[in-house]
Curated annotation (Swiss-Prot):
<feature type="binding site">
    <location>
        <position position="146"/>
    </location>
    <ligand>
        <name>a divalent metal cation</name>
    </ligand>
</feature>
<dbReference type="InterPro" id="IPR001260">
    <property type="entry name" value="Coprogen_oxidase_aer"/>
</dbReference>
<feature type="binding site">
    <location>
        <begin position="109"/>
        <end position="111"/>
    </location>
    <ligand>
        <name>substrate</name>
    </ligand>
</feature>
<dbReference type="GO" id="GO:0004109">
    <property type="term" value="F:coproporphyrinogen oxidase activity"/>
</dbReference>
<keyword id="KW-0627">Porphyrin biosynthesis</keyword>
<feature type="binding site">
    <location>
        <position position="97"/>
    </location>
    <ligand>
        <name>a divalent metal cation</name>
    </ligand>
</feature>
<keyword id="KW-0479">Metal-binding</keyword>
<dbReference type="InterPro" id="IPR018375">
    <property type="entry name" value="Coprogen_oxidase_CS"/>
</dbReference>
<protein>
    <recommendedName>
        <fullName>Oxygen-dependent coproporphyrinogen-III oxidase</fullName>
        <ecNumber>1.3.3.3</ecNumber>
    </recommendedName>
</protein>
<keyword id="KW-0350">Heme biosynthesis</keyword>
<feature type="region of interest" description="Important for dimerization">
    <location>
        <begin position="241"/>
        <end position="276"/>
    </location>
</feature>
<feature type="binding site">
    <location>
        <position position="93"/>
    </location>
    <ligand>
        <name>substrate</name>
    </ligand>
</feature>
<comment type="similarity">
    <text>Belongs to the aerobic coproporphyrinogen-III oxidase family.</text>
</comment>
<dbReference type="GO" id="GO:0046872">
    <property type="term" value="F:metal ion binding"/>
</dbReference>
<dbReference type="InterPro" id="IPR036406">
    <property type="entry name" value="Coprogen_oxidase_aer_sf"/>
</dbReference>
<feature type="binding site">
    <location>
        <position position="107"/>
    </location>
    <ligand>
        <name>a divalent metal cation</name>
    </ligand>
</feature>
<keyword id="KW-0963">Cytoplasm</keyword>
Length: 305
């Protein structure tokens, strides 16, 4: 798998560079700061963070490549056949929290995992996806986001987008709140149903689609005026983001349990959050419409070309 791992690593480093350049250009003020780090147990990465910009209040685009002699519990719990295997995990993960409540938070991740044991076939798979978390949502933005997702999946089969869209809706769900984190997108894991080259081509299609999905929405919304009440609602909804990442997110749990770099793992958390006891939006308000209409499992592309 050595050549395969090298090819994936080269792609992921380039993807990180391209996404950072596009986001810096869109912000126009802030620049990413890079923190290269090493993991004592094996591997390391490039954490890049940005904040206090004209657009981005806090964000990060991380690359990591970690390896070790045995898997953490979060990885082997649902794959007991991997126990006793050495592993390599590579990925790019990003979260962008804009200051303007009219610009959604976005998250994307593409990753590769390989577990090897002498004398046995390697076990490998890809995972990833991207999802959108609006605060003041617009239907045209939701349609655009999902159209880009569908088009990225299309060359790999007509069933791919619906399957991974549904998986995303199911995965990014706060069970204790019985509500989705956002309006979804794509999510997939354990991808090895095709040969390596096809799976790798698919992961590249998804990684490359993120900027095409996100920047047009940013450009439409970043100059929309907002007030303090809307910022407070954004902070309240960001609380849901924190709850999901710390309680349910498999990537967060894997990173913490595998001795990953805590600062990089928790980079996804927003800078300002608030919780209010049993707070509910005014009936009929924009805030109420978010949960009543947008945060529902729906086919955003029904009737769309």
């Amino acid at each position: 798998m050595t050549d395969h791992i090298a090819a994936v690593k080269t792609y992921l480093l380039d993807l990180q560079d391209r996404i950072c350049a596009a986001l810096e250009a869109e912000d126009g003020k802030a620049r990413f700061a890079e923190d290269a780090w090493e993991r004592p147990a094996g591997g390391g990465g490039r954490t890049r963070v940005i904040g206090d910009g004209a657009l981005i209040e806090k964000g990060g685009v991380n690359f990591s490549h970690v390896f070790g002699d045995s898997l953490p519990p979060s990885a082997s719990a649902h794959r007991p056949e991997l126990a006793g295997r050495g592993f390599q995990a590579l990925g790019v993960s990003l979260v962008i929290h804009p200051e303007n409540p009219h610009v959604p938070t976005s998250h994307a991740n593409v990753r590769f995992f390989c577990a090897e044991k002498e004398g046995e076939e390697p076990v490998w798979w890809f995972g990833g996806g991207f999802d959108l978390t609006p605060y003041y949502a617009h239907e045209e933005d939701c349609v655009h986001w999902h159209r880009v997702a569908r088009d990225a999946c299309a060359p790999f089969g007509a069933d791919v987008y619906p399957r991974y869209k549904e998986w995303c809706d199911r995965y990014f769900h706060l069970k204790h709140r019985n509500e989705p984190r956002g309006i979804g997108g794509l999510f997939f894991d354990d991808l090895n149903q095709w040969d390596f080259d096809t799976c790798f081509a698919f992961i590249r299609a998804i990684g490359d689609a993120y900027i095409d999905a996100y920047l047009p929405i940013v450009q439409r919304r970043k100059h929309t005026p907002f007030d303090e009440r809307q910022r407070e609602f954004q902070a309240y909804r960001r609380g849901r983001y924190v709850e999901f990442n710390l309680v349910f997110d498999r990537g967060t749990l894997f990173g913490l349990q595998s001795g990953g770099r805590t600062e990089s793992i928790l980079m996804s958390l927003p800078p300002q959050v608030r919780w209010g006891y049993d707070w509910k939006p005014e009936p009929g308000s924009e805030e109420a419409r978010l949960t009543e209409y947008f945060l529902a499992d729906r086919d955003w592309l029904a009737g769309q070309p």
